[in-house]
């Protein structure tokens, strides 16, 4: 008579049975973590890229009253139509500068190249650095306000107590006369605000005697 196999089935320890599931869970966590890390890096990169892109977009379109940068003067003669240009000056809090336009308002012919001057004084006892942000109002005129030269293109470093005269060369593009949205425009206001950039580097001390080294 054949004997029945009474051998009990082999039991796998619980730790071994759980190991594959645990490894799968760890793998999923690693993938999710990697995806999240990549998203964070992309978001940070996008935030930095957005600043220069926004500045380029404003310059290209005149959006938000941003003026344009001209490489040369217009080739045609100025038009008979004239327009007033007002100059608004501001200094951000914490920047010890005095900033004024030599004239608060002038009248120019459309297409006429004009040079105006601003005076800036560093009223502190330390060297400071700043750069001017700018726009024009009404905002629709920004695309037609062309600057050939401006102190706002670069950072400005002022020594303690220094006063400097800063020119701006500009013209109002004759193309504004074809924009019927500006048919009734009588005045453009050019606004500047100086913002501190960072602490200027301290000059290396000159003429200081060498400190003694070791025992005499």
From Swiss-Prot:
Pfam families: CtaG_Cox11 (PF04442)
Family classification: Belongs to the COX11/CtaG family.
Domain of life of the organism encoding this protein: Bacteria
GO MF terms, alphabetically ordered: copper ion binding
Gene: ctaG
Record keywords, A-Z: Cell inner membrane, Cell membrane, Copper, Membrane, Signal-anchor, Transmembrane, Transmembrane helix
Name of the protein in question: Cytochrome c oxidase assembly protein CtaG
Organism, as annotated: Bradyrhizobium sp. (strain BTAi1 / ATCC BAA-1182)
Membrane topology of the entry: Single-pass type II membrane protein
Membrane-crossing segments per the record: 28-50
Entry keyword annotation includes Transmembrane: yes
Subcellular location, record wording: Cell inner membrane
GO CC annotation: plasma membrane
PANTHER family hit by this protein: CYTOCHROME C OXIDASE ASSEMBLY PROTEIN COX11, MITOCHONDRIAL-RELATED (PTHR21320:SF3), CYTOCHROME C OXIDASE ASSEMBLY PROTEIN COX11-RELATED (PTHR21320)
Keyword Transmembrane helix on entry: yes
Topology Periplasmic: residue spans: 51-216
């Amino acid at each position: 008579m054949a004997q029945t196999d009474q051998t009990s089935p082999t039991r796998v320890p619980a730790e071994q049975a759980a190991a594959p599931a645990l490894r799968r869970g760890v793998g999923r966590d690693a993938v999710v973590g990697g995806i999240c890390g990549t998203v964070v890096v992309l978001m940070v990169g996008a935030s930095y890229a957005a600043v220069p892109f926004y500045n380029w977009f404003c310059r290209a379109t005149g959006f938000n009253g941003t003026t344009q940068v001209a490489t040369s003067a217009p080739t045609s003669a100025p038009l008979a139509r004239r327009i007033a240009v007002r100059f608004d000056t501001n200094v951000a809090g914490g920047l010890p500068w005095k900033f004024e336009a030599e004239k608060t308002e002038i009248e120019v012919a459309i297409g006429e190249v004009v040079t105006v001057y601003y005076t800036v004084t560093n009223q502190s006892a330390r060297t400071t650095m700043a750069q001017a942000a700018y726009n024009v109002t009404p905002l629709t005129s920004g695309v037609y306000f062309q600057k050939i030269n401006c102190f706002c293109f670069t950072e400005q470093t002022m020594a303690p107590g220094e006063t400097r005269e800063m020119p701006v060369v500009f013209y109002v593009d004759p193309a504004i006369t074809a924009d019927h949205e500006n048919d009734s425009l009588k005045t453009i206001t050019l606004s500047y605000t100086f913002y501190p950039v960072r602490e200027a580097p301290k000059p290396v001390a000159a003429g200081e005697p060498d400190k003694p080294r070791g025992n005499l």
